[in-house]
Regions:
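Glycine-biased, low-complexity coil/linker segments
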Residues: 335-337
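Active-site loop segments of alpha/beta catalytic cores
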Residues: 1-26, 83-328
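Helix-coil boundary/capping segments in enzymes
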Residues: 29-96, 103-106
Length: 337
């Protein structure tokens, strides 16, 4: 069974012979997936260091991705002269074609990068965009037309290629809940996502959706409108038992050892137990679980913990499910709660 088929079977609950593994940022030869994204236009020249094609400027102060420090859409008047990037510009999908030319037998994930809501907040500014959702809905819809229009054109081009899934990355949660009211999300964003997911499915591809934070209130919505894979890097925040009870068997989960604590400060035994716990709870005998591995040194993950995570997830392919109870965590040192 090829690596591509193993991932497909896990997503479709069709009897994957082992747990597939996605590597995010290193050790790609060990990954069952390969990722590619659209790139800059070939003729794009930033006006200053860190400027994106969208017109905002990235500020990176540490080893994380950083955040925009300027926002081009300062008000409604700024839309008049704003020119978004051309989704069909020369060179836009060159990297995708390069990856596809030597992808071997792996499952190909085409990523849209930062999408939808997050992209809109980068253009307008986070606080201003949230205020506009309540005070100037027409302006919000115009911004979203720009963002989703660009993405829809990129999707149209990507799904004509032999990719297996389109990946959306929109962080919707805080530690406590959704950034906006769930009903507002359903009114403004759900229909736009539904259209995009239908576009992907109509081309015979899978929908892979990443979101950080406590997004529990919209999980059923995402499943209802067509998400095939839900990628969560903080499964403890959502509650693994609860995820399994309410959504197990309905969607494939791609999860990491919880990045907020376990992956960073867990012992070897804790990491191994948690990997098995994720597999046993979120997966089924036919699939439904994909392991996610990322080197998160920027958050304090040691090389030792990274290697333990690798060993733990790869060891799942040698064992049968045991319905492991949730493994306890060692107490945090005083002052780190």
């Amino acid at each position: 069974m090829s690596r591509k088929e193993i991932v497909h079977r896990a997503i479709e609950f069709a009897g994957a012979e082992r747990v597939p593994i996605h590597y995010c940022n290193r050790d790609f030869d060990s990954s069952d997936t390969v990722a590619c994204e659209y790139g800059r236009a070939a003729d794009f020249v930033p006006a200053e260091p860190g400027m994106s094609e969208w017109g905002y400027v990235w500020e990176v102060l540490d080893k994380t991705m950083g955040q925009p420090r300027t926002h081009p859409l300062t008000g409604r008047d700024s839309l008049v002269c704003y020119v978004p990037p051309d989704p069909k510009a020369c060179g836009r999908l060159d990297e995708v074609d390069r990856v596809l030319s030597d992808k071997d037998d792996r499952f190909v994930k085409f990523g849209l990068g930062i999408t939808g809501f997050n992209q809109a907040t980068f253009l307008r500014g986070f606080e201003d965009f949230l205020a506009d959702l309540y005070m100037d809905r027409e302006f919000v819809e115009e911004i979203l037309d720009i963002v989703f229009g660009f993405e829809n054109s990129i999707i149209e081009q990507a799904v004509q290629r032999p990719v297996d899934a389109v990946v959306f990355a929109d962080d919707w949660g805080t530690q406590q809940g959704l950034i906006i009211a769930p009903d507002l999300w359903r009114e403004v964003f759900r229909p736009r996502y539904a259209d995009q997911f239908a576009q992907v499915h109509n081309a015979g591809k899978k929908v892979w959706f990443h979101s950080c934070g406590h997004v529990y209130s919209i999980i059923q919505d995402l499943i209802d409108i067509g998400v095939d894979v839900l990628e969560f890097l903080q499964p403890d925040l959502l509650g693994v038992d609860r995820l399994a009870e309410e959504f197990g068997g309905k969607v494939c989960f791609c999860c990491s050892i919880d990045h907020q604590r376990r992956a960073i400060s867990g012992t070897r035994d804790e990491i191994f137990a948690y990997a098995q716990y994720l597999r046993d709870k979120l997966g089924t005998s036919n699939g439904g679980f994909i392991a996610y591995i990322e080197d998160y040194a920027c958050l304090g993950m040691s090389e030792q913990n990274y290697q333990w995570i690798r060993e733990a997830f790869h060891s799942l392919n040698l064992n049968t499910p045991t319905q492991t109870p949730i493994p306890p965590m060692s107490p945090l040192p005083l002052g780190e709660g």
